[in-house]
Design a protein with these regions (language model features):
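Helix-loop-helix junctions that connect adjacent transmembrane helices in secondary transporters/permeases
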Residues: 147-238, 403-481, 612, 683-697, ...
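Catalytic phosphate/nucleotide-handling subdomain of diverse soluble enzymes
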Residues: 462-524, 539
Length: 762
């Protein structure tokens, strides 16, 4: 292959590193209205009255909107970026009289500059009826205090939701008699695991610019992963036709799932629609930390049974998830906690997976890389590590006895067959990379420091099978170059480059001959968006199919110009020539010009792809940590990982994805946490309090690949974006256990907890 599986530089790399104007705030007029939001100081309250009279008199203020400007009995909407009908409930109003978390929107203020808007915000007088809040998600289900008591709350999908019970979702599934299987096991691990909410903390905060175009339509330029879903969300929130909304995206300064929720879009859209003036809203870092869409807090009760020789026979999992004040992504994230952890163990005879998603008066949760699988894998993989210790077995040897194999029917994975899998090879590769045999379990380095290793496995999906859609449009231009139009959003991942590589491979042309345009709801073909690890696998397949069709048509038109049958010509990427006489040829440029002059053979195609399967990528990770038993400090000296993502379309970009995900997983394990005070106020409201590991906080990260070949993916590719965050959690927590002999069931694991555990043992 000439372009696929080659380490090309990102197409936008030079523009980014040289500081060219590519992000939203670089591209828009600076004299637009500034929009800011007045937010609730209470976790649960009703706005009795709101007085904006004085604030409206501030010079430069254009408009102030409150709940009185939004019909409270109107149909609600969701901000989740999901295919319609969304699994997430319709539980929001643009501005609701009932505020449900500290940071919920009370008023929208628009003015000519920040100074006047900030002054007006301080002059708005609000009288609240403060209500008792639901702040403990353990007590939320069937609590007499209802987060959503309203009658116009609506669930479009059969997910077991009931707002009168504070239930955003409930589900049960299983196979076999799990209780009987566990009763017959020699060893049963039975523990509850708890992962806290944590932030995506992308560099570019939420931001949106809106204007009215020549035809009176609302144009929205937003830092989003989901242009088509955002269009629907905006239209639903404003109660206007979708045909009146256009959404496009510039380059995006990071998303990691946060921008799969339309967090910022509806507010400037409302201002512009009402005033007919351009406006922008840019979240401060405080707002992005306290009123965004973080990972769901989850608690997982795992019962895992095995024989005395280490064969896992049954897994019983109950997950309780905290969706916060609104239900975005609640019903779908919780499913992955079981459906992306249990299938790793292909020899299990029975499983049961039950889940509840509850409303509380915390910040609304959303999508974050890993999307629920991260939490579930921490629980299940930690239980497997504990099983290995209980059986006095090497955790790697135990994994090799149990891992799902290619051709297996995967438990808890909707009856799907494993069509591509190099998981066992990944396990062996990581054992070699970290020098497991010499480092496991621990080594006392003296002076109170102990080094230890731990490992974990992970899987994810490749898109949402049978639901989400990827599309691509390809056309040959008049000078012999191609334009690829996509609806997927490049969030910095380099998908514009990888999709262009797929097209270039089929068309046998240099990568620079493919220009990429996207994503814009007016001109891009429909695409569900860049989430669920779908872009390479789903949109990539659409691109491959589209390029193949275009190649066929190029040959067909070339044959017509050469006056010979279509099956008598070949195409080498530059010319179409007659097979029997290669001197008879037409250049690509000649064919392009001919297509524009009286010919009926089109050289522009759109292809759409939906996959009935979601083949899992796999990853194995191992961590070496150094624990200071006096201070409790943990240093991650080395993290080694091996990934099976099928064929890596661009190995460099794939490796960078893995390294970034590993770093995020390390942060979730050791430092990152959202905590609330007794009144529901989040404490970590800036990056001073919310500790993200920097690159110099971590030692060496090594990533290798063991490639399987996925027959349903483009050139054998699967996904890479999400699986990479999942293994640090169980690997590091088990390494800490190997160092100090205390097992932790809650994340993050802090130095204080470690120091106290060591002191308690002494």
């Amino acid at each position: 292959m000439k372009t696929v599986n080659k380490p090309f530089r990102k197409k936008d790399a030079m523009q980014l590193v040289t500081g060219q104007p590519v992000y939203m705030d670089d591209l828009i007029p600076q004299d637009c209205l500034i929009v800011k939001l007045l937010r609730s100081p209470h976790a649960n309250a009703i706005v009795r009255s709101i007085n904006t009279a004085v604030a409206k008199k501030v010079p430069g203020i254009e408009a102030i909107f409150t709940w009185e400007d939004v019909p409270q009995d109107a149909r609600r909407y969701t901000q989740a970026g999901q295919t319609y009908p969304e699994a997430s409930p319709y539980d929001r109003l643009l501005i609701d009289r009932h505020v449900r978390f500290v940071g919920d929107v009370v008023a929208i203020v628009a003015g000519k500059d920040e100074k006047c808007v900030d002054k007006a915000l301080k002059l708005i007088k609000v009288d609240y009826e403060v209500l008792e809040a639901v702040l403990d998600f353990h007590t939320a289900k069937d609590n007499p205090i209802l987060v959503h008591p309203e009658d116009n709350w609506e669930s479009l999908a059969p997910v077991g939701a009931d707002n009168k019970r504070n239930l955003c979702a409930h589900d049960e599934c299983g196979n076999g008699d799990i209780d009987a299987v566990l009763a017959g096991c020699d060893v049963v691990i039975d523990h509850v695991y708890h992962t806290k909410a944590c932030q995506q903390a992308m560099m570019e905060t939420f931001r949106t610019y809106c204007s009215i175009d020549t035809y009176g339509r609302l144009n929205v330029l937003s830092s989003t992963q989901i242009v088509f879903h955002a269009r629907r969300n905006i239209a639903n929130a404003l109660h206007i036709p979708k045909s009146m909304v256009r959404v496009s995206k510039p380059r995006i300064g990071g998303g990691f799932g946060a921008k799969q929720t339309a967090v910022s879009e509806v507010y400037p859209a409302f201002v512009t629609w009402m005033t007919k003036k351009p406006s922008k809203l840019i979240f401060s870092r405080v707002e992005s930390q306290t009123a965004s869409s973080p990972r769901h807090e989850m608690e997982m009760h795992v019962r895992l049974g095995a024989t005395k020789d280490g064969i896992v026979k049954g897994i019983d999992l109950y997950t309780l998830s905290n969706t916060g004040a609104y239900g975005e992504h609640g019903p779908t994230t919780v499913g992955l906690s079981g459906h992306k952890s249990i299938p790793l163990y292909g020899k299990a005879e029975a499983f049961r997976f039950v889940s509840d998603v509850v409303y509380t008066n915390h910040m609304s949760a959303g999508a974050y890389r890993g999307y629920g699988a991260t939490q579930g894998l921490f629980a299940v993989e930690s239980a497997v590590n504990e099983l290995a210790h209980k059986l006095n077995m090497d955790p790697i040897a135990l994994r090799l006895k149990n891992t799902v194999q290619e051709g297996d029917v995967m438990p808890a994975y909707y009856g799907a067959v494993n069509t591509s899998c190099a998981l066992d090879r990944c396990v062996l590769k990581v054992r070699e990379m970290i020098d497991w045999e010499h480092k496991y379990p621990a080594r006392d380095m003296g002076t109170g420091k102990i080094r230890a290793v731990g490992m974990g496995m992970a899987m994810q999906g490749s898109g949402i099978s049978g639901m989400d859609v990827g599309s691509a449009t390809l056309k040959l231009n008049d000078d012999g170059f191609y334009t690829l139009m996509i609806g997927a959003a490049d969030m910095g991942t380099g998908c514009d480059t990888t999709l262009a590589q797929i097209a270039a491979e089929v068309l046998d042309c240099p990568l620079d001959n493919i220009t990429v345009f996207g994503a814009d709801t007016d001109s891009s073909p429909y695409d569900s968006g860049s989430y669920a690890s779908s872009t390479t696998y789903v949109t990539g397949k659409a691109t491959e199919k589209c390029a193949m069709k275009l190649r066929e048509q190029i040959c067909k038109l070339g044959a017509e110009l050469l006056e010979c049958p279509a099956d008598a010509v070949e195409f080498d990427g530059k010319v179409v020539f007659e097979s029997a006489d290669p001197t008879r040829q037409k250049t690509l440029s000649e064919i392009a010009f001919a297509s524009q002059f009286g010919h009926k053979i089109p050289l522009e195609f759109t292809e759409t792809h939906t996959s009935p399967l979601s083949p899992p990528p796999y990853m194995v990770g191992a961590a070496e940590v150094e624990v200071d038993t006096e201070t409790g400090e943990v240093k991650v000296l080395e993290f080694d990982a091996c990934v099976d993502c099928g064929t890596p379309i661009n190995p460099n970009l794939t490796r960078v994805q893995a390294e970034g995900g590993i770093l995020q997983g390390i942060g979730m394990t050791l430092t990152e946490n959202i905590t609330y005070d007794k009144n529901g106020y989040p404490a970590e409201n800036s990056l001073f309090q919310y500790k993200i590991p920097a690159r110099n906080d971590i030692g060496h990260i090594h990533v290798e690949f063991e490639n399987s070949y996925e027959p349903n993916g483009p050139f054998g590719a699967k996904s890479i974006g999400e699986v990479v965050i999942n293994t640090p959690l169980p690997a590091i927590s088990d390494a800490i256990y190997n160092a100090i002999g205390t097992r932790f069931y809650e994340l993050p694991i802090t130095p204080e907890q470690i120091a106290m555990a060591v002191a308690a043992k002494q």
